[in-house]
């Protein structure tokens, strides 16, 4: 039994680390552009900039569905310069360094 668990756990860890394929760009360190780089639509549930979920100006909850190649744009004007973007989707969570 423990042998099966050891074989399954690495697969789960690898699968959860993959997350959705999203491309990110920043403009003037305030505007974040997220593009769905997958072949299937995905839904963006939450975006957190600079690992600051407690600051409302650094969080967006758009519930936006993006088809393949489609882009979602959000301005984080009152947040500090964008250094990292955490994106939570219906397919998992991914952290992106847009710089």
Question: For each of these PLM feature ranges, what is it?
Answer:
Residues 19-25:
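Bacterial lipoprotein signal-peptidase II cleavage site
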Residues 32-39:
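Asparagine-centered strand-capping/turn motif at beta-strand->loop junctions
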Residues 14-17:
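C-terminal motif of bacterial Sec signal peptides marking the signal peptidase cleavage site
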Residues 42-54:
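Short acidic, flexible loop segments centered on an aromatic residue
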Residues 54-82:
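Intrinsically disordered, low-complexity Pro/Gly/Ser/Thr-rich segments with frequent PxxP/GP/PP motifs
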Residues 76-99:
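Terminal connector regions
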Residues 27-30, 80:
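Short, solvent-exposed loop/turn segments enriched in Ser/Thr/Gly
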Residues 1-7:
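Bacterial N-terminal signal peptides that target proteins for export
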